Amino acid sequence: GCFRMYITDAEGKEHNIPFAAEGDWIYDIDSFHATTPSQSNIQALEASEVIQIAQKDLYYLYLNILKLDRIFKVVTEEKYVELQNRVFQNISSTAQQRYLSFLKQYPNLANRLPNTQIASYLGITPEFLSMIRKEIASGQ
């Protein structure tokens, strides 16, 4: 299945942060490790199978299966790089460039997600996303 993590602003508008699909994982890293309430929400966008683990159980596995600890560190670093790149793109890229980056990062989700979800991730309206898609399709 597919998930989204999102926050809701003061006006009640939802803003998607990342998506996660089959074989991926998604969680509020700050909330999980600091054991504090989450500032974000996670929603399944499709029928999904969820595997969850308690913090103490994950820490136990880290201590007792060193290879697992290394795998989680590598995955966490990869997710951090993705988030860092997204921040850089939001600051310095056009909406079309951000959409092309989305297609590269989430190639299997572009046809599975509604325009509203993708537009929220890109920080644009669904109508503007449709315009971008038309421009790309026409080769402009």
Map each language-model feature to its residues.
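Glycine- and acidic-residue-biased ligand/ion/polar-headgroup-sensing regions
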Residues: 1-6, 11, 22-23
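A short, polar/charged loop-to-alpha-helix boundary motif
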Residues: 14-17, 135
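Cyclic-nucleotide recognition modules
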Residues: 16-74
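Alpha-helical bundle regulatory/interaction domains
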Residues: 64, 68, 72-83, 91-92, ...
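Phosphate-/nucleic-acid-contacting segments
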Residues: 93-140
